[in-house]
Amino acid sequence: MTDLSQHTPMMQQYFKLKHQHPDQLMFYRMGDFYELFYEDAKKAAKLLDITLTARGQSGGKAIPMAGIPFHSAEGYLAKLVKLGESVAICEQIGDPATSKGPVERQVVRIITPGTVSDEALLDERRDNLLAAILGDERLFGLAVLDITSGRFSVQEIKGWETLLAELERLNPAELLIPDDWPQGLPAEKRRGVRRRAPWDFDRDSAHKSLCQQFGTQDLKGFGCQNLTLAIGAAGCLLAYAKETQRTALPHLRSLRHDRLDDTVILDGASRRNLELDINLSGGRENTLQSVVDRCQTAMASRLMSRWLNRPLRDRAVLEARQESIACLLERYRFENLQPQLKEIGDLERILARIGLRNARPRDLARLRDALAALPDLQNAMTELEAPHLQALATTIGTYPELAELLAKAIIDNPPAVIRDGGVIKTGYDAELDELQALSENAGQFLMDLEAREKARTGLPNLKVGYNRIHGYFIELPRVQAEQAPADYIRRQTLKGAERFITPELKAFEDKALSAQSRALAREKALYEELLERLIGHLAPLQDSASALAELDVLANLAERALNLDLNRPRFVEHTCLHIEQGRHPVVEQVLETPFVANDLALDADTRMLVITGPNMGGKSTYMRQTALIVLLAHIGSFVPAARCELSLVDRIFTRIGSSDDLAGGRSTFMVEMSETANILHNATDKSLVLMDEVGRGTSTFDGLSLAWAAAEDLARTRAFTLFATHYFELTVLPESQPAVANVHLNATEHNERIVFLHHVLPGPASQSYGLAVAQLAGVPAPVIQRAREHLKRLETTSLPHEMPSQQSGKPASPMQSDLFASLPHPVIDELSRINPDDISPRQALDLLYAWKMRV
């Protein structure tokens, strides 16, 4: 620590406080500014684009300094939090008028990316999560806290791959890991990673602190008693939250045990490829959520995002949601609910700020308005017969006493902050009313007093006045002073007048001189009392907020079902996926022409479709729409199809498109193979797999062989698979794999121009239309013409070469010119003798590397 003796008393105070918070930027309150010094000032000046200056000297050197006005701090804090910085807010808690030496200061809260709760610093449509992990490569404990809602969950996860996929789903703003973990672990590639002392994860201490927080003897009631790693992580989160908030956390009331087996698992690649709530460019437009989310409240939009990113496998829950949506669609009942739900606002985060004791006056006004809207909402719900909706109505309840309390206490349009008062309504508190009246109506009181005293004494020249030295007084001319009543007490003698004070005027003086400051202090005290009373009702209010958010989502899904022509899917016990007239919910919204709907049939007999057809023909759209229909069904929503019948799936995999992972040192093909390996290792007969153009990132031989072997492996696994490819050789797979069928996207050529029809038809495609697509893309005409010449020559010189599945003597399916025929080589002879059914994917990969060395 710096030698404090070299510095001024004020800077000594600063260094002592900064020493306690070395990792945070210190916002040090000085009058109307927050000042930053030394390295904090340099960093803030760069990040916030503010002026770096100097404040005199301390220790013989100029002090780098940067400052921001305290009344506009929110905007700067928001920018710092988005950049991943943490800030310690140091306020003046002493009175400058009475302080000897520097005004007493104290860090009142720490703002970090994962614990921020201020409305202005948050994205209202996204969860803001704090996470912690503990364990090793075999088993991890993961704890997740949303301090802005009170949701607190734990789970245990096997292996880095599953953990990283879960972290990508959660996308925490801040991630805590033990300080004794080795450097460079996969988790550290994420944003907002902070190392904490190993003892912060101590499991015994964590168990004790969690039980104390929830008021229980143990954690058995939460179903996580034996999750020792997760409990250690949760204890670290709780300690970190208390450290940063500097207050109790009454809105953290329970711990939820999340289980991956209860959900449809999507890895990071699948979530990105399906563009659930973030598109491939990082924006929110043209995503699934942008189409299906018309929720009235921000808390419902966040719940919708959680549903989309964590589909369920609980058929009872899903069918209860479906029944609720159907009920809300009857007689357009959702239309009666949505305007009333809009009045509720973001109740979830308002209640969290009340629990954190940093709720602002407008939060209480919004809570008042929300509670006032509940009776009408309850009346509208009385006709809803669906059991799940009735249960939600019971949980929502009404709070007439709290609604009345807030209506009496808070003015209609309060200011943003309590700092300057003007929040509490007149008539709520007699003492406050009197103080405010004294402060605001002192002049009128003095005029009334003067009139009364003139009438009482009969002295017409009597005056009531005030000066800063002697205070309030009654003044009489010297000649009338002897006629002053007995209760007049002499206060000051002037040359031509005498000044007096009376007990009534003295009492008024005592009140009036301090009325403004006392009124503000009283108003702040009343505000704190309001918060305390609300905290006493926090548990049922939070339950109501959760139920209101779910009701909003269900009403939204009913509205979307009506306006997007969605229909109720049916879950069945036998394994199948049947879709009639399925549509892509996002693509059809942006098309200027009608979307071409298509069917899909997968069941016990057909587990895989090999999809061929031209580029831009609709293969990827067809596959993605299938995944989105399945996903929507697994959140309980209606789906964009005329009819859908399906069994529950355990995972949705997508291998669609790739790009280089330059930061990770991985090529496009390496990324593609990593995703393929993940699918081959983890797909089951209950999974849905989308494979698009596997093998295109390497040489023709390698790519075709890998695609072939991967398709055969998935066929043996019996996962529901859509396998799109331009390797027409793969269309012979049904001859060796009975559970595989061919379909194609049709197109036609007219005047050497391609016309995409987008219909999915049985059987393989007859040609690829590659040159027509190139022409459509704007490839120069001479290049297209030269390509046609090359194509004709290749078609005449390349003879069909017998593929493994044709050795039975069956005729080959239509395909492009064989890629092997014009390239005689010993490797081809070896390849022709191999039966792909007899080798594993690993053996195929080994052979490819061996052949590559020889070619």
From Swiss-Prot:
Stretches for region Disordered: 796-816
Keyword hit for Zinc: no
GO cellular component: cytosol
CDD domains found in the cross-reference section: ABC_MutS1
Superkingdom per UniProt: Bacteria
Residues at which ATP binds: G613, P614, N615, M616, G617, G618, K619, S620
Gene Ontology molecular function terms on file: ATP binding; ATP-dependent DNA damage sensor activity; damaged DNA binding; mismatched DNA binding
UniProt-listed InterPro entries: DNA_mismatch_repair_MutS, DNA_mismatch_repair_MutS-lik_N, DNA_mismatch_repair_MutS/MSH, DNA_mismatch_repair_MutS_C, DNA_mismatch_repair_MutS_clamp, DNA_mismatch_repair_MutS_core, DNA_mismatch_repair_MutS_N, DNA_mismatch_repair_MutS_sf
Pfam family, one: MutS_V
Entry annotated with the keyword Cytoplasm: no
GO biological process entries: mismatch repair
Key words of the record: ATP-binding, DNA damage, DNA repair, DNA-binding, Nucleotide-binding
Family, per entry: Belongs to the DNA mismatch repair MutS family.
Function: This protein is involved in the repair of mismatches in DNA. It is possible that it carries out the mismatch recognition step. This protein has a weak ATPase activity.
Stated name of the protein: DNA mismatch repair protein MutS
UniProt organism field: Pseudomonas aeruginosa (strain ATCC 15692 / DSM 22644 / CIP 104116 / JCM 14847 / LMG 12228 / 1C / PRS 101 / PAO1)
